[in-house]
Amino acid sequence: MKLADVEERMQKSVEATQHDFNSIRTGRANAALLDRVMVDYYGTETPLRSLANVSTPDATTILIQPYDRSTLASIEKAIQLSDLGLTPNNDGSSVRLNIPPLTTERRKELVKTAAKIAEGGKVAIRNIRRDAIDHIKKAGKAGELTEDEVKDLQEKVQKLTDKYIGKIDALLAEKEKDIMTV
């Protein structure tokens, strides 16, 4: 196992955590809120983004314009069933989502959700570290690496772990600030 592979896997964990953060509502309209919404399209669960153009005409509105108008009702239903807590307004050709301002209580809940997402990302990075260190130890026992090389590689893996956990902490701090800003 190469350090570059370990670093790439850790970077992907950070990117996945960032993607999960983007799905948290912050009080401003953000098309990424709808990334996880799946629409029943002729019996198949299909991502909303592949059925419609999603835009944010202003800071409090998301506009969904389906490529096929027959999907309007399905899109509306999928949004209602999602955990976003938003009410869709169907005007016959598009669906509008008005983003209400968040209450202080809801903001605190969202900060807790963000912390859980961050912890999930950190756990993924720690698992990558554990796998890498196990691999290094096996190589050391097999005689492929000297004791000094094993120790050196373990230190490098730990430094990578610290670096990427720091990145997740920074993303979390940024998201918390974003959520708590009125």
Curated annotation (Swiss-Prot):
Keywords: Cytoplasm, Protein biosynthesis. It holds the Pfam family RRF. GO terms for cellular component: cytoplasm. One of its GO terms (molecular function) is ribosomal large subunit binding. It is found in: Cytoplasm. Responsible for the release of ribosomes from messenger RNA at the termination of protein biosynthesis. May increase the efficiency of translation by recycling ribosomes from one round of translation to another. This is Ribosome-recycling factor. Its main location: cytoplasm. InterPro entries: Ribosome_recyc_fac (IPR002661), Ribosome_recyc_fac_dom (IPR023584), RRF_sf (IPR036191). It comes from the Bacteria. CDD domains: RRF. GO terms for biological process: translational termination. Belongs to the RRF family.
